[in-house]
């Protein structure tokens, strides 16, 4: 499967500003993710939830059941939520 664009709903940049944790790697909210971010990746795992940090767990009651997802309209682009393994490397 080839990923062309990814849309995210959280706004966390990978910078080391004091208001953000340095162990996170996330993307700008509502923007197309350029292909160069995933150019060297061979495998991307698709999961049903976003973890705020690689070492934290998301409570089960906050995860949307896959049967409860809204139907996409004609003009709504499909989206997916990704969790990247800690052993993947960004160049």
UniProtKB/Swiss-Prot annotation:
Keyword entries, A-Z: Chloroplast, Plastid
UniProt main location, coarse: plastid
Top-level taxon of the source organism: Eukaryota
GO cellular component, one term: chloroplast
Subcellular location: Plastid, Chloroplast
Protein name from the UniProt record: Uncharacterized protein ORF91
Source organism per UniProt: Phalaenopsis aphrodite subsp. formosana (Moth orchid)
